C-alpha cells in the first residue's frame, strides 16, 4: 500500500499522471501477470516531473517485472524527498 500511496500523492499534484498508470493482469497477457502497475513511458514530456523524478522517460518500456521497478521508484522518490528537507 505504501507504493500506491506515494503514487497517488504524486498524481494529485499539478500535472496528473494517473492516465499513465494502467492496471496489469489483462486477460491473455503473459508479460504483466505478476505486475502491480505498468508505466507506459509517457512521462517524458511532463516538465516538472523530469526535475522532481530525475527524468523517467521511457520508464519500464515492456512492463515486465514492474513490481521491482515501482518499488525502486518508490525508494528513489523517498530519497529525493528527504534530500529536500534535510541537509
Swiss-Prot record:
Provenance organism: Dictyostelium discoideum
Source lineage: Eukaryota, Amoebozoa, Evosea, Eumycetozoa, Dictyostelia
Family affiliation: Belongs to the UPF0512 family.
Protein name from the UniProt record: UPF0512 protein B
UniProt superkingdom: Eukaryota
